[in-house]
Amino acid sequence: MSSADSTPPWLTLVGIGEDGYPGLGKQARRALLQASRIVGAARQLELLPPCIGAARETWPTPFSLEPLLARRGQPTCVLASGDPMLFGVGASLARQLPATELRVLPAPSSLSLAAARLGWALQEVACLSLVARPLAALQAQVHDGRRLLVLSNDGDSPAAIARLLNARGFGASRLSVLEHLGGPLERRLDGLAGDWSLPRAADLNLVAVECRAGAGAVRLPLTPGLADEAYRHDGQLTKRDVRAVTLARLAPCPGELLWDVGAGCGSIGIEWMRAHPSCRAIAIEANDERQEHIRHNRDALGVPTLHLVAGSAPEALLELPEPDAIFIGGGVTAEGVLETCWERLRPGGRLLANAVTLQSERVLLDWQQRLGGDLTRLGVAHARPLGGFDTWRQALPITLLELRKPAARKPPRDA
């Protein structure tokens, strides 16, 4: 065990609330009084009294950490809203700097203050931020009976949230807009999404949502295998039952990256990302119309950060980051596709390919004989009317090849 670095951190993050300097603790005040340079948003810097003599700098527009990091090692204070490590600049800095270079002095977050005002148990609430993020990210969080705390991007966010809820059939949901939490201008506005009439709130606001589904609400469960009707497509869709099996075989885990090669309408990548907020996916699709379907579906189903690559495999794969899993829903007979996918797959990763035609089945059988893996055939039948009776209507059988790339061997220990 090594001792911690004794060098004091050069960067101090001070969380500040709407109550400004008087609301800070002793450590935070001392840090600001001793600082030679303070960086923050103009609104936050204006909360400091004249006794703080440090040079003050606002963040550049558009926002960037580069000017701050260019002075790495020079003692600096950064002002942040509430808890800097909760949807704040602290989280961004922590991804680029080791913990030994940071000292964080948090204040109560607006999420904590909102939970206190509403009497909600914070650990039972879904918390998310729309600050510089697409509104569509909210779609994956809307479920009957669920409570949400949403950090707004600006004063237009509450009305936009109400419109989204209405479009999903959640007009009965109760909204509470909490403005300037913790400050002298604090205000609360309540109403139903279906009756929301406030055109614009204060820019600094948080929206609390109690989700209530109406009779026509669109239900989007978290398990794989969403209804086929949830997708806009031209027929190039991995059908619901096969999709559920495919996702189970791909086995998404937090933080993992998927390539969806020949993505069609994007269903596999979308449901991969819905498995956990940190899951990532890249959809590779050459057809222009299907690319539009992917853009629509990723927003409608709450994963707007799904990355779409317009192009054909294998050429479109060459510059992409290495994936933890790959799904090939079409194109296994195209020259070089399987070879490139297998080469780029991380050690220990999973590759799953589906085939319908005899030609594509032959390719999968050849790969299975060379590399092993699981070869499975799925047959799905649905009851359909036939005259005055019902009969089973068989869908085209699907052949699945599941391969796992051997993990990299650890070097032997020295004797």
From Swiss-Prot:
GO terms for molecular function: precorrin-6Y C5,15-methyltransferase (decarboxylating) activity; protein methyltransferase activity. SUPFAM superfamilies: S-adenosyl-L-methionine-dependent methyltransferases (SSF53335), Tetrapyrrole methylase (SSF53790). Keywords: Cobalamin biosynthesis, Methyltransferase, S-adenosyl-L-methionine, Transferase. It catalyses: precorrin-6B + 2 S-adenosyl-L-methionine = precorrin-8X + 2 S-adenosyl-L-homocysteine + CO2 + 3 H(+). Pathway: Cofactor biosynthesis; adenosylcobalamin biosynthesis; cob(II)yrinate a,c-diamide from precorrin-2 (aerobic route): step 7/10. Pfam families: TP_methylase. The keyword Transferase applies. It is an enzyme of class 2 (transferase). The keyword Cell wall biogenesis/degradation does not apply. PANTHER family: COBALT-PRECORRIN-6B C(15)-METHYLTRANSFERASE (DECARBOXYLATING), COBALT-PRECORRIN-7 C(5)-METHYLTRANSFERASE. Belongs to the precorrin methyltransferase family. This is Precorrin-6Y C(5,15)-methyltransferase [decarboxylating]. It comes from Pseudomonas aeruginosa (strain ATCC 15692 / DSM 22644 / CIP 104116 / JCM 14847 / LMG 12228 / 1C / PRS 101 / PAO1).
